[in-house]
Curated annotation (Swiss-Prot):
The protein's Enzyme Commission number: 3.1.26.5
Protein name: Ribonuclease P protein component
UniProt entry keywords in alphabetical sequence: Endonuclease, Hydrolase, Nuclease, RNA-binding, tRNA processing
Subunit structure as annotated in this protein's UniProt entry: Consists of a catalytic RNA component (M1 or rnpB) and a protein subunit.
Domain of life (superkingdom): Bacteria
Protein family membership: Belongs to the RnpA family.
GO cellular component: ribonuclease P complex
Listed InterPro entries: Ribosomal_Su5_D2-typ_SF, Ribsml_uS5_D2-typ_fold_subgr, RNase_P, RNase_P_CS
Length: 126
C-alpha cells in the first residue's frame, strides 16, 4: 500500500501538478509530474515523491473505479523509492484502465516516468 506521506491529498497540489507540470500520455494512463523544487513554497518536509490518482466516472461505475484506484496505489508504492524526490506525480486513469491488467498498468506507468526522466537509478549496496 502507498504510505501516507507519499500521497497527494490537497486539491491545490493536484491542480499545480496537472496545470504546471509535464504530461506524458499512455494508452490507459496520463502521467502528470511536477518538480516541487521549482516553487520554493511547495517544498514539503517529507523528502520523497508524492503520488495522486484521478479516476473519473468515464472509467466505469464505482466498483470498477475503486478497483482501478487500488491497483494504481499498489503500483505507485513500488515506485516510491525509484522516482526522484521532490516530485509530485498525478496519474489520470483513462477508460481502458478498467480492463488493463496490473502488469500492463505498471508497464505504462514505468514508461511514462522513464520518458520524463523521473526514475533515479537505484544503486545496489553491498
Amino acid at each position: 500500500m502507498l504510505p501516507e506521506p507519499s500521497r497527494l491529498r490537497r486539491h491545490a497540489d493536484f491542480s499545480v501538478a496537472v496545470r504546471r507540470g509535464r504530461r506524458m500520455g499512455r494508452r490507459d494512463l496520463v502521467v502528470h509530474a511536477f518538480d516541487r523544487e521549482q516553487v520554493e513554497a511547495l517544498v514539503v518536509t517529507n523528502h520523497g515523491p508524492r503520488f495522486g490518482l484521478i479516476v473519473s466516472k468515464a472509467v466505469g461505475p464505482a466498483v470498477i473505479r475503486h478497483r482501478v484506484a487500488r491497483r494504481l496505489r499498489h503500483i505507485c508504492a513500488d515506485f516510491v523509492g525509484q522516482v526522484s524526490p521532490e516530485t509530485d506525480v498525478v496519474i489520470r486513469a483513462l477508460p481502458g484502465a478498467a480492463t488493463a491488467s496490473s502488469a500492463e498498468l505498471a508497464k505504462q506507468l514505468r514508461g511514462g516516468l522513464t520518458k520524463m526522466n523521473l526514475l533515479v537509478s537505484v544503486s545496489e549496496e553491498p
